[in-house]
Amino acid sequence: KHYSEMLPVEYVPTDQYMQVYHNALKHYAKPVANAVGMLADKIIENKGKKMVLVSLARAGIPIGILVKRYIKFKYGINVPHYSISIIRGRGIDDNAMKYLLEKYRPQQILFVDGWIGKGAILNELKKDISAYEGVSADIAVVADPANVTELCGTHEDILIPSSCLNSTVSGLISRTFLRDDIIGRDDFHGAVYYGELTDSDLSYDFIETIEKEFNMENTPDLEKRVESQGIDEVINIGKNFGIDDINLIKPGI
């Protein structure tokens, strides 16, 4: 079966694991807020004030909310924000794209994600978006350690604390799924709501903790010459370990 046809059981993280998350949030709230501000400034500068933020589900959801809130904080603009499913090997949610394009001009749509690791989803997006004339395949991200986009808050490999958690920092929704026996031809891709995890939900806590660190002025990265892209590292790891499928290689700690 394709991974998009299955959903894992999601558990409440252990107290020890949650301590790691809270420590990460304490140490990285300010750098993440700074990067969100830098990203929002670049979005306004490059895309104007009429853009529509479209988060890639699900890691992009809290990031899109932070960018939306920063733009409201600094520029006083309440930009629309949506989330859309994109599944490696299955593509972007075509019905959701049609819905968006009935409401907005193609040039207004801007995709948002948390970070770019090796660029697999970016490549999927570029392939799919060519079918929608006028829609840009650019992704706005907080962190781009892969060095593939300038539309980012930082190229530093900062730890975005929301990456430590699953549904409990993303509004209690699962990653998206696509199964023919559940999802009809005219339906959006599916997701499950984990209501049983309500008592462990930290979605608003994460957003509000970062939001408290927002500044009107943000500190840009020192310009650094990009020597290589993250995908080059992944390919080299694959060669060294005899792994042909780069989807089996996950950049991380």
Question: What kind of feature is each model-predicted range?
Answer:
Residues 1-51, 72, 76-253:
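Long, low-complexity, Lys/Arg-enriched
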Residues 60, 69-73:
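Long, mid-chain structured domain cores
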Residues 66:
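Active-site signature of alpha/beta-hydrolase-fold catalytic machinery across serine-
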